[in-house]
């Protein structure tokens, strides 16, 4: 899935669209990526002399990736809402030039609520992991 297809599914836009492409996708799992550039707006303040991608934005990228997994087959007018986070851990810095990989898997589904396990890696090293909750709402 390329960026044009992603933008047809997700409501997010620059500078807050944090997924550049999808590498793998099936009913229960997704693998997507973000090419982290020095031109990202958040690097202006986080931190100018030592740029690091904020952990909360890594988790937001996971949530957006979850939205792609959950909305890939719908033609309804719905949006994914990030409703919760558990067990978040940040293990390695994400820096300009990194290719950040998001791997997400559905753990539970109840009505329009989903719990997913997310792992973010750079060069196969875990940068962050979390369990996230996403709700699907008609817009």
Swiss-Prot record:
GO cellular component terms attached to this protein's record: cytoplasm; membrane
Entry GO MF terms: (3R)-hydroxyacyl-[acyl-carrier-protein] dehydratase activity
The keyword Lipid biosynthesis is assigned to this record: yes
Localization: Cytoplasm
Catalytic residues (UniProt): 46
Keywords noted in UniProt: Cytoplasm, Lipid A biosynthesis, Lipid biosynthesis, Lipid metabolism, Lyase
Record's catalysed reaction(s): a (3R)-hydroxyacyl-[ACP] = a (2E)-enoyl-[ACP] + H2O
Biological processes, Gene Ontology terms: fatty acid biosynthetic process; lipid A biosynthetic process
Tagged with keyword Transmembrane helix: no
Cross-referenced Pfam families: FabA
Principal subcellular localization: cytoplasm
Function: Involved in unsaturated fatty acids biosynthesis. Catalyzes the dehydration of short chain beta-hydroxyacyl-ACPs and long chain saturated and unsaturated beta-hydroxyacyl-ACPs.
Similarity remark: Belongs to the thioester dehydratase family. FabZ subfamily.
Name used for this protein in its record: 3-hydroxyacyl-[acyl-carrier-protein] dehydratase FabZ
Organism this protein belongs to: Petrotoga mobilis (strain DSM 10674 / SJ95)
Originating gene: fabZ
């Amino acid at each position: 899935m390329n960026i044009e297809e992603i933008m047809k599914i997700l409501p997010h836009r620059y500078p807050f669209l944090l997924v550049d492409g999808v590498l793998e996708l099936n009913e229960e799992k997704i693998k997507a990526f973000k090419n982290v550039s020095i031109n990202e707006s958040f690097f202006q303040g986080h931190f100018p002399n030592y740029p690091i991608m904020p952990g909360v934005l890594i988790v937001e990228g996971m949530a957006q990736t979850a939205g792609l997994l959950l909305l890939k087959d719908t033609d309804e007018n719905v949006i994914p809402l990030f409703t919760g986070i558990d067990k978040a851990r940040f293990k390695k810095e994400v820096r300009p030039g990194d290719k950040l990989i998001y791997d997400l898997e559905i753990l539970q589904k109840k009505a329009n609520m989903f719990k997913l396990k997310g792992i973010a890696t750079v060069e196969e090293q875990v940068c962050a992991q979390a369990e996230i909750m996403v709700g699907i709402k008609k817009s």
